[in-house]
From Swiss-Prot:
Protein source organism: Gallus gallus (Chicken)
Locations listed in the record: Endoplasmic reticulum membrane; Microsome membrane
GO CC aspect terms: endoplasmic reticulum membrane; intracellular membrane-bounded organelle
Gene Ontology biological process terms in this record: response to antibiotic; xenobiotic metabolic process
Recorded GO MF terms: heme binding; iron ion binding; monooxygenase activity; oxidoreductase activity, acting on paired donors, with incorporation or reduction of molecular oxygen, reduced flavin or flavoprotein as one donor, and incorporation of one atom of oxygen; oxygen binding
The protein's required cofactors: heme
Class of the enzyme per the UniProt entry, highest EC level: oxidoreductase
Gene that this polypeptide is encoded by: CYP1A4
Protein name listed in UniProt: Cytochrome P450 1A4
Phylogenetic classification of the source organism: Eukaryota, Metazoa, Chordata, Craniata, Vertebrata
């Protein structure tokens, strides 16, 4: 076998292999690209500074540093470089914002400057590039579609329920699913003695959003519903893995399994939604609006004139809006509920306080309602602390500057990608006393009788400003209704002697490791039982 420099030269000059000339051309191209990468960065105008940050490697930037737990790495770096810092991912400069006040300054007070989305290649496959959440568009048409989506979602959540036991449709849907879960969990206890509730939570939460968006509740073993749940899980897994080609342009011209998988799962989900929308079109009756999809179709068919023509939704945008609403109302709620149940099991004394509050305020005869939220401050504080402590959404979807701007004295050029480190803000020792500890009381007044709105508003989970999650209100309501209904009926614990690892696993939403040791038992006999 040939070895050493001489052998290498022989191979380089062999027919069919890379020649010395090609090596020189490749090296020159690399140097040119490196030079372009360095010169493409705009220098700050006189009197301003560019954000500080760690040096990166040529072509790779800081990718290697950020491979594992980027929320923790960026939090550590923020201690050195401050709340406005710059890292490089591939050849792309990225500004990372930390600190609650800095994030509020950017997303709320300078909202127009930071409301853009970066034009990442992979995002064109989300709703065929028409996604409200991922699209780089942020003009009047986008704002009108976003408002339409919010109104439709809210309308079919708080609309009056036909049943006397619920005050609105959301309560009715959640009550149906939560009752199913209570029965299912008790059945699983008889069969297995311990289990993992998360897959059942997923299906129930998916059923709620299906009922609101599509007017349909599925059986829990329905293959269409399970397929949707699996697609959403696939989307989260692929998106969390990231696509290097979004930040390293050269990789776009090479075979890319990650991009292919992302494209495939989005195409399958769009086809699922498109089929349902087409079915709604064929059965649409403007005198009988059944769900969010009907509401959007009705709005689409209204004749618009003048300025309104530009913002009228198309048939294609209806599919993308429903796509977004489903995504906004599914994975975040499921993950938040799974964390709430884990914390309730880990801290039984806290669980008992919640149940005592439920017994005293609601009793055991009727189910919790949204109108009870204001009378259950400790329960609300528990949910907020679960949001803060888990920081299940460590980052928002990346933002982008819409024009040259200045933040905290640092110059940030137009079209700069911006990461919002929500995890850092939720664990900032400057804001929170003893942030690693789980303490719902931090959100209550001194007497423990009222929720502190000031403290509650410090928790970042759904983003801020003009790109704030459109499903935030519905998501918070769902978590409250599911959790209170389950804890009213069941006592949650972990199997004795089992070690549980709740270290968040980094992803689009952060989850703890699979845990098969949940145990549940009924808190009191059913009405009419012995």
């Amino acid at each position: 076998m040939a070895a050493g420099p001489q052998a290498a030269m022989e191979q380089a000059s062999s027919p069919g292999l890379i020649s010395a000339t090609e090596v020189l051309v490749a090296a020159a191209t690399f140097c040119l690209l490196l030079l372009l990468t360095q010169t493409r960065r705009q220098h700050a105008p006189k009197g301003l500074r560019s954000p500080p940050g760690p040096r990166g490697l040529p072509m790779l930037g800081n990718v290697l540093e950020l491979r594992k737990d980027p929320h923790l790495v960026l939090t550590r770096l923020s201690r050195k470089y401050g709340d406005v810092m710059e890292v490089t991912i591939g050849s792309r400069p990225v500004v990372v914002l930390s600190g609650l006040e800095t994030i509020k300054q950017a997303l709320v007070r300078q909202a127009e400057d930071f409301m853009g989305r970066p034009d990442l290649p992979s995002w064109q496959y989300v709703s065929n590039g028409h996604s409200l959440a991922f699209s780089y568009e942020c003009g009047d048409a986008w704002k009108a579609r976003r408002k339409l989506a919010q109104n439709a979602l809210k309308t079919f959540s708080i609309a009056a329920s036909p049943t006397a036991s619920s005050s609105c449709l959301l309560e009715e849907h959640v009550s149906t699913e939560a009752s199913y879960l209570v029965t299912k969990f008790l059945q699983l206890m008889e069969e297995k003695q311990s289990f993992n509730p998360n897959s059942y939570l997923m299906v129930s939460v998916a059923n709620v959003i299906c009922a609101i968006c599509f007017g349909k509740r599925y059986d829990h073993d329905d293959q269409e519903l399970l397929s949707v749940v699996n697609m959403n899980t696939e989307f989260g897994d692929v998106a969390a893995a990231g696509n290097p080609a979004d930040f390293i342009p050269l990789l776009r011209y090479l075979p890319n399994r990650a991009m292919a998988a992302f494209k495939d799962v989005n195409a399958r989900f769009s086809a699922f939604v498109q089929k349902i929308v087409q079915n709604h079109y064929s059965t649409f009756d403007k005198e009988h609006i059944r769900d969010v999809t009907d509401s959007l179709i009705g709005h689409c068919q209204e004749k618009r004139t003048g300025e309104d023509v530009r913002v009228q939704p198309s048939d294609e945008s209806i599919i993308s809006i429903v796509n977004d609403l489903f995504g906004a109302g599914f994975d975040t709620v499921t993950t938040a509920l799974s964390w709430c149940m884990m914390y309730a099991a880990l801290y039984p004394h806290i669980q008992k306080k919640i149940q005592a509050e439920l017994d005293q305020t609601i009793g055991r005869e009727r189910r919790p309602r949204l109108s009870d939220r204001g009378m259950l401050p400790y329960t609300e504080a528990f949910i907020l602390e679960a949001f803060r402590h888990s920081s299940l959404l460590p980052f928002t979807i990346p933002h982008c500057t819409t024009k040259d701007t200045v933040l905290n004295g640092y110059y940030i050029p137009k079209d700069t990608c911006v990461f919002i480190n929500q995890w850092q803000a939720n664990h900032d020792e400057k804001i929170w006393k003893d942030p690693p500890s789980f303490k719902p009381e931090r959100f209550l007044n001194a007497a423990g009788t009222e929720l502190s709105r000031t403290e509650a508003d410090k928790v970042l989970i759904f983003g801020l400003g003009k790109r704030r999650c459109i499903g935030e209100s519905i998501g918070r309501w769902e978590v409250f209704l599911f959790l209170t209904t389950i804890l009213q009926q069941l006592e949650i614990s972990l199997a004795p002697g089992q070690r549980v690892d709740i270290t968040p696993q980094y992803g689009l939403t952060m989850k703890y490791k699979q845990c098969e040791c949940f145990q549940m038992k009924k808190r009191f006999p059913s009405k009419g039982s012995a």
